[in-house]
Structure formats: structure tokens, C-alpha cells
């Protein structure tokens, strides 16, 4: 494989010295970029874009052509695993993802296969290999998956949800059925992420988008327990260097200590968590990623720079910070504002690394 020219993102995740704080953006390949919209139109629809390795590679690289980002993230979707399990994923205009065959019972869980990452999910591995080839060692490639709990919410609810009553009903009335589903998903995610690593992903991230809707006790039992199982089963070295793992529970700032005990390398923070407080609590154990409010990108350039400066000062001197948004970039953000953000992180962070 090609020698990595810029490894500051990987170094920061391992709390090693860097020259400036590395930065990337969740959903950096996305609808805020006109070139993304053009490629998506060419593909026909979202899943066709994910399943075409050349086009998935193209949209992965688009933000890197505009901005000096320190990492690329695989262009894919968290719902690839449930789709490969045969639930019939489709997208409804204005409604988001839906499944034709949601999981309603233990019998439904028992029928679900564990997908072979190189067969049913081979299109994802093809995309990883294509992107690695085209990156030519410029920056590392991040692979990812949804967490078992987050995937289960979509599979049981039949799509997106606001109140999560269907899955919570299963959790409280039929906990064995939900545990069986989460266990199957944990095995599937472990295989899926390890296949991404073997295909060339140099770091992986687990997105627990809906962990924050749980009580503390339920979070431990139904979300964190299964992410811990995945971390335990991951390949932690490939191509002669460590493959860092980042866990991100949106709305999970109160559980950072428990998350840091999983053996992951880094924790993602959303914008509701104070980064100085997070560093005091777990900074001696894990790196931190985050955590500007994505809506700040609607602000003026000076206001964006001020916010970047505030977050950098909050983290303070030294290593172990990857700058990011606290969640995905919004689709109607001006691309120039994203450029202001990336440039400000590099310029304003240099003094913190001297």
C-alpha cells in the first residue's frame, strides 16, 4: 500500500504529537456540495450511489478537492447491514429510510442472516478498495458502521422515529428478543468493520446515533455492552500500524467514563458536551473528537473562527483532539463557510502543539 503522506488524524487518535489539530466533518461528502448533487443525480438514487464503487469514490474525494481535510470517510450508509439482512430498505421522499419487513418478534430475529461482508456487502468493500487506490496515500480513510442499538431502532421501528416507542416496547416487554437481535447485529458489525479494515480502512468509527434516547442503565445493557463486544473483536493492527476505533453516542456526554472503558481509542462528542469537561474526565485515557454545533456554519466567518478558537481553548494544550462538528453538516450550508471552518482549525490550533 502507498505510504501515508498526512497521518495527523491517526496520530491524534492515538494521542501522539501533531503539528496542528486534524479536522474532518461528519457528512463531509454530502448535499451541501453542488458536485455531490450532480454525482447523485448521475447515480439515479442514494443507494445506487452507495453501490457504485466509482461514484462512491468520487463523492468521497469531492470534499478533499475543496478543503485541506485530514481524513476521508467512506461514502456509504449505516443501514447497509439491515439491507443485506433482507429487510427491504427503501427511501421515501421527505420521510427518510424505511423497511418493507421490520423486525417484530423473536421469530423474525431468528430468521435474519449474518451477512457475509465480501458477498452481500461486497459493494462496500469494493468502494473501500477503490477509494484507497484513488487517495494515493494523501490522507487516511475512515470506515464506519452504525451501532447495534442504532441499527435495531430502524429495523424494529421500520424506519426513522421520534419517540422510539416500538423498540422500547420490545426492550421492556420482550428483552430477550431485543438482546438476540443486538447480539446478531454485534456479530455482523464486527465482521463488517474487520472486512473494511482488510479492504483498506485505516480507522473505524461506530455511530450510535440513538443511544442518547436511553436511560443510563438501558444504555449500558442495550447499547454500550454491544459496542464493547465489537471493540473486543476488531482488528486493531493492519498494514503495520494501529487501526484506531472511535465510538460516538449522540447525546451520550454523561456516559463518557463508561465508554472510555471499552478499549476504544477515541470518543466522539456532540455539541452539548463541554470539551474541557470531557477532557478532564477521560482525556488521560482516550482522544476526543468534536464538537462544534453544525448550525454554527450558518454564521459569519468571524463568528465561525471565534467558535473554533473557543473549542480549541477548551481542549487546551497537547495531543488527543480531532476537530469535527458535533454531528453531520447540514445540507443547506454554504460550502465557503465549511472552508472557513477547516482553515481556522489548522491556523488557530498550531500554538497548542508547540
From Swiss-Prot:
Gene3D superfamilies: 3.20.20.210. PROSITE patterns: UROD_1, UROD_2. SUPFAM superfamilies: UROD/MetE-like. InterPro entries: UROD/MetE-like_sf (IPR038071), Uroporphyrinogen_deCO2ase_HemE (IPR006361), Uroporphyrinogen_deCOase (IPR000257). Its main location: cytoplasm. The record marks 77 as: Transition state stabilizer. Substrate binds at residues 27-31, 77, 154, 209, 327. GO terms for biological process: protoporphyrinogen IX biosynthetic process from glutamate. Keywords: Cytoplasm, Decarboxylase, Lyase, Porphyrin biosynthesis. It is found in: Cytoplasm. It catalyses: uroporphyrinogen III + 4 H(+) = coproporphyrinogen III + 4 CO2. CDD domains: URO-D. Its EC number is 4.1.1.37. GO terms for molecular function: uroporphyrinogen decarboxylase activity. Catalyzes the decarboxylation of four acetate groups of uroporphyrinogen-III to yield coproporphyrinogen-III. Homodimer. This is Uroporphyrinogen decarboxylase. It comes from Klebsiella pneumoniae subsp. pneumoniae (strain ATCC 700721 / MGH 78578).
Amino acid at each position: 500500500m502507498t505510504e501515508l503522506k498526512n497521518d495527523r488524524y491517526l496520530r491524534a487518535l492515538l494521542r501522539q504529537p501533531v503539528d496542528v489539530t486534524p479536522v474532518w466533518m461528519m457528512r463531509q461528502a454530502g448535499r451541501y456540495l453542488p458536485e455531490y448533487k450532480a454525482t447523485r443525480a448521475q447515480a439515479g438514487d442514494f443507494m445506487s450511489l452507495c453501490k457504485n464503487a466509482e461514484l462512491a469514490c468520487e463523492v468521497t474525494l469531492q470534499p478533499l478537492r475543496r478543503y485541506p481535510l485530514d481524513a476521508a470517510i467512506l461514502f456509504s450508509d449505516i443501514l447497509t447491514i439491515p439491507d443485506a439482512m433482507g429487510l427491504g430498505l427503501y427511501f421515501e421522499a421527505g420521510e427518510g429510510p424505511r423497511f418493507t419487513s421490520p423486525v417484530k418478534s423473536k421469530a423474525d430475529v431468528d430468521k435474519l442472516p449474518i451477512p457475509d461482508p465480501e458477498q452481500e456487502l461486497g459493494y462496500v468493500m469494493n468502494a473501500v478498495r477503490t477509494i484507497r487506490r484513488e487517495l494515493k496515500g494523501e490522507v487516511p480513510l475512515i470506515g464506519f458502521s452504525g451501532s447495534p442499538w442504532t441499527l435495531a431502532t430502524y429495523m424494529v421501528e421500520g424506519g426513522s422515529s421520534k419517540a422510539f416507542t416500538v423498540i422500547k416496547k420490545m426492550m421492556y416487554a420482550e428483552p430477550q428478543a431485543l438482546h438476540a437481535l443486538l447480539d446478531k447485529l454485534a456479530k455482523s458489525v464486527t465482521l463488517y468493520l474487520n472486512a473494511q479494515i482488510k479492504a483498506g480502512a485505516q480507522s473505524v468509527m461506530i455511530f450510535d446515533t440513538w443511544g442518547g434516547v436511553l436511560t443510563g442503565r438501558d444504555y449500558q445493557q442495550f447499547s454500550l455492552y454491544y459496542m464493547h463486544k465489537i471493540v473486543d473483536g476488531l482488528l486493531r493492527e493492519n498494514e503495520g500500524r494501529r487501526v484506531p476505533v472511535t465510538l460516538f453516542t449522540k447525546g451520550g456526554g454523561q456516559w463518557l467514563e463508561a465508554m472510555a472503558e471499552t478499549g476504544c481509542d477515541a470518543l466522539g462528542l456532540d455539541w452539548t458536551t463541554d470539551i474541557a469537561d470531557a477532557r478532564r474526565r477521560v482525556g488521560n485515557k482516550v482522544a476526543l473528537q468534536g464538537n462544534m454545533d453544525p448550525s454554527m456554519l450558518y454564521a459569519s466567518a468571524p463568528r465561525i473562527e471565534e467558535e473554533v478558537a473557543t473549542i480549541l481553548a477548551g481542549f487546551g494544550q497537547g495531543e488527543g483532539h480531532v476537530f469535527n462538528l458535533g454531528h453531520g453538516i447540514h445540507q443547506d450550508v454554504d460550502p465557503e463557510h465549511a472552508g472557513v471552518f477547516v482553515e481556522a482549525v489548522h491556523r488557530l490550533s498550531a500554538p497548542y502543539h508547540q
